[in-house]
Amino acid sequence: MKHYEVVLMIHPDQSDQLDAMLGKYRGIIEEKGGKIHRFEDWGRRQLAYPIEKLHKAHYVLFNIECPTESLEKLQESLRYNDAILRRLVIATKEAITEPSVMMESNEKEVI
């Protein structure tokens, strides 16, 4: 199985339905024996430029390990979901489990 990093920008009005939406995507990944190595909810953030007249989006990152057919099903599901403003799927060489730079910066802001 291959490793991937997935970043989603979700419509800010859909933050309430986020758990159900991500549960559906988790099911697609784990259906064929895939694993989620890291999941981070970056929360609502300012966009660099407006997308569909929106200035904020809810960001989510997860690192997964799954077969190619599960990834194709996941990408198709993401493509046809109107709540997903942007998506990025990158193949990685290995599972990444340490906190991302975004999460580290969030921890510094809280302190």
From Swiss-Prot:
GO molecular function: small ribosomal subunit rRNA binding; structural constituent of ribosome
GO cellular component, one term: cytosolic small ribosomal subunit
CDD domains cross-referenced by the UniProt entry: bS6
Gene Ontology biological process: translation
Transmembrane parts of this sequence: none
InterPro entries linked: Ribosomal_bS6, Ribosomal_bS6_sf, Ribosomal_S6_plastid/chlpt, Transl_elong_EF1B/ribsomal_bS6
UniProt entry keywords in alphabetical sequence: Ribonucleoprotein, Ribosomal protein, RNA-binding, rRNA-binding
Top-level taxonomic group: Bacteria
HAMAP family registered for this protein in UniProt: Ribosomal_bS6
Function recorded in the entry: Binds together with bS18 to 16S ribosomal RNA.
Family note: Belongs to the bacterial ribosomal protein bS6 family.
Name under which the protein is recorded: Small ribosomal subunit protein bS6
Gene field: rpsF
